[in-house]
Amino acid sequence: MADLSNTKLNYVTFNQDHSCLAVATSRGFRIYHTDPFSKIFNSDEGNVTIIEMLFSTSLVAMVRSPRHLVIQNTKRGSIICDLTFPTAVLAVRLNRKTLAVVLEEEIYVYDIGNMALKHTIATSPNPNAIFALSPMSDRSYIAYPMPKPREDQGERRPAHAPPLSEYVPPTSGALMVFDTTAGKAVNVIEAHKMPLCCIALNHEGTKVATASERGTIVRVHSVPEGHKLFEFRRGTIPSTIYNMSFNLSSTLLCVSSSSETVHIFRLASAQNANAGGAGPAALETPGSPRANRWSRSKSIDGSEYSPSGDSDSSPRGETPEAGPSGPSAARRQSGTFGSMLRRSSQIVSRSVAGAVVPYLPQSVAEMWEPQRDFASVKIPKPTNAGDALLGPCL
């Protein structure tokens, strides 16, 4: 990717089966094979802000100007469709039957076979394009934050004022699941207490992962039933979740956030994990690096323990960074009396939870002890943070 050294990156994303990588730049776009890594297509025509592929086909969807979407056949070099929208295009997703285009207050759903508009979905203001489309067309679901109707209809507004939108920003973490084949909403999942920050559907469209604005808890529900399957603890410090992605077999979930750490969670039941020696007891044996991480976790002033919701309740923090050694570092590690007291309290809380949780029903136990990641990676901070929008992280 040396040819991108002097080019501004606008958008980076994998295709639906992660076999290709598409890169949108200020000078066209590039498409790469991931295994083995090699460039398979290059275009230097104009500024491309968003690009999405349709599996490994030659069909790509591109945004070149804020309200302008182009569907192009890269093999023939021809434009298949040219669409203009009333407001800026914030996100685009495709599967073999559906094209979904996200605006700030609407989602346009097209039949990809003939590019006919099938549905227009009104949403709450969604400037961050929080939304997901399942890659498989057999179970074609769209997931997005549940719209909140406006209670104040603005009766006292002056006549010359523009009309108010139908919905207001959501105040809860409810998730709407829309079936694009049936053309209707099929379920509302109460995923979090706080508004949603990130949504991801797995390859088959049977699971949905969600994170709230707090970013400490990640939950996985079944689709369309809405049963909670997993609950994971990303960390204790609130953070913005940028992306989540399932692997193709839906056994792993990758989460990236503003903490500059990528967490990988294993989607396995507690019984299976313990049977395979990968449960919490096996992973966090005394003296292990993960167990030692507990004692080095960062404390939060004024935090309170709450066994449910998205509260900052877990004693576990982010992966510690390697710092300088010496007397000053030793003083920082020892901390104040207050931090030592908090660490002692956390250790006692963990001991109590470890003794009590095995005797509780599973639904209650997971509230006390959400599953942790089994791997995490600390990534370097980019020189120009925010220059590129990133697609799925796995």
UniProtKB/Swiss-Prot annotation:
Residue ranges of WD repeats: 4-42, 191-231, 236-275
4Fe-4S listed as a keyword: no
Biased composition regions of type Basic and acidic residues, renumbered to the chain: 148-158
Compositionally biased spans, kind Low complexity: 302-312
Function: The PI(3,5)P2 regulatory complex regulates both the synthesis and turnover of phosphatidylinositol 3,5-bisphosphate (PtdIns(3,5)P2). Necessary for proper vacuole morphology. Plays an important role in osmotically-induced vacuole fragmentation. Required for cytoplasm to vacuole transport (Cvt) vesicle formation, pexophagy and starvation-induced autophagy. Involved in correct ATG9 trafficking to the pre-autophagosomal structure. Might also be involved in premeiotic DNA replication.
Complexes and interactors: Component of the PI(3,5)P2 regulatory complex.
Protein name from the UniProt record: Autophagy-related protein 18
Organism listed in the record: Chaetomium globosum (strain ATCC 6205 / CBS 148.51 / DSM 1962 / NBRC 6347 / NRRL 1970) (Soil fungus)
The encoding gene: ATG18
